[in-house]
Regions:
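Alpha-helical membrane-associated segments of multi-pass integral membrane proteins
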Residues: 102-148
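Loop-to-transmembrane helix junctions at the membrane interface
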Residues: 57-94
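Alpha-helical transmembrane segments and their membrane-interface junctions
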Residues: 24-32, 87-117
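Alpha-helical transmembrane segments of polytopic integral membrane proteins
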Residues: 23-28, 55-59, 130, 134-138
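Structural motif marking the loop-to-transmembrane transition
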Residues: 3, 7, 11, 38, ...
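Lipid-exposed faces of alpha-helical membrane segments in multi-pass integral membrane proteins
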Residues: 19-23, 27, 55, 84-88, ...
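N-terminal signal-anchor transmembrane alpha-helix
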Residues: 1-51
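Membrane-interfacial segments
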Residues: 31-38, 62, 66, 70, ...
Length: 148
């Protein structure tokens, strides 16, 4: 089964975010419509929901392409992705006006202030979560699809 390995790599990469994003959407709908959150979450939700699976799929394809030269384990490769997503998301958020960077915190939707210390803790958690997801879930899918 050596036909179309990059398509199979893309499919194994999009598996995790495609399963998790509907749960995230349900949480945001609950927050916005049921709990009446006073800020427009939907402005900052649609673009990341469309972009995250594509990034994961392309990142998986990149691993397949570069693994022979780099020898980088899949979990480590996956843990690098948040280091690209955080600056990219911050740049896009500032450009569209949903993020304002302050001296000690980030203001989100002109309503919620998030201290940089909390962002740092969440980022560290994300790096570990990405490592585990890529090592165990995407790695298993790669083996099942015959590309690992």
């Amino acid at each position: 089964m050596n036909t179309h390995p990059y398509i199979r790599a893309f499919l194994s990469g999009i598996f995790v975010p495609t399963l998790l994003l509907p749960l995230l959407l349900a949480g945001f709908v609950l927050l916005r419509l049921v709990l009446r959150a006073p800020f427009p979450i939907e402005r900052g939700l649609i673009f990341p929901m469309a972009l995250a699976p594509v990034l994961w799929g392309l990142w998986s394809m990149l691993w397949l392409r570069s693994h022979a030269q780099t020898g980088l384990p899949l979990g480590v490769h996956g843990a690098i992705l948040p280091f690209l997503m955080l600056p990219g998301g911050t740049l896009i958020g500032r450009h569209v006006g949903i993020l304002v960077l302050g001296a000690r915190s980030v203001t989100w939707f002109e309503a919620v202030r998030i201290p940089y210390a909390l962002i740092g803790c969440a980022f560290a958690f994300a790096v570990v979560a990405y490592y585990l997801a890529w090592k165990y879930i995407v790695g298993t899918l790669n083996r099942v699809l015959g590309i690992a």
